[in-house]
Each structure stands twice: as structure tokens, then as C-alpha cells.
Amino acid sequence: MSDINQNLARRPFNRRRKTCPFSGTNVAKIDYKDIKLLQRYISERGKIVPSRITAVSQKKQRELANAIKRARFLGLLPYVVK
């Protein structure tokens, strides 16, 4: 019985890496006017969610951050949420 528990405890847990939702064919383009898309990448408090959580690639994360900042500047998105 204890051998089974030891084998289960030693078994490594490999989580499959998510793919970038903006890479590939037929995907949504990052646009500062697309508020519904941008709101999925903003936390409840209005902060930009990091790419390690959303699995967005580094290049697309920069585009996303710039689009969010541009939308905030134009008043389409709030800077902070109460």
C-alpha cells in the first residue's frame, strides 16, 4: 500500500502550455476600438493581466498593452475600477 502512495507522490505533474489566442489563422486582430476583446485582458481592478496567466505571446502582449493604453487615453476604457 505504501509503495503505491510513494509512486503517486513522485510522479511529476506536467501542465500543458496554452497557446497564444492571437497567433494562428482566422483569429481576432488586436484593435484599440474592440472594447469587448480588450476587457478580457483587464482585471477586475482595471489592471492589465500578465501574459503568464492569459498565455499571450510576448509580442502580442505588447500590442495588447499598447491597445489598452490607447483605449484608456481616448476614454474607451477606465484607468481604474472601483
UniProtKB/Swiss-Prot annotation:
Keyword Glycoprotein: no
An individual GO BP term: translation
Pfam families for this protein: Ribosomal_S18
Gene3D superfamilies from the UniProt entry: Ribosomal protein S18 (4.10.640.10)
GO cellular component: cytosolic small ribosomal subunit
GO molecular function: small ribosomal subunit rRNA binding; structural constituent of ribosome
Top-rank taxon: Bacteria
UniProt keyword list: Ribonucleoprotein, Ribosomal protein, RNA-binding, rRNA-binding
Oligomeric form and interacting partners: Part of the 30S ribosomal subunit. Forms a tight heterodimer with protein bS6.
Family recorded in the similarity comment: Belongs to the bacterial ribosomal protein bS18 family.
HAMAP family according to UniProt: Ribosomal_bS18
Functional note: Binds as a heterodimer with protein bS6 to the central domain of the 16S rRNA, where it helps stabilize the platform of the 30S subunit.
Protein name: Small ribosomal subunit protein bS18
Source organism (scientific name): Bartonella bacilliformis (strain ATCC 35685 / KC583 / Herrer 020/F12,63)
Gene of this entry: rpsR
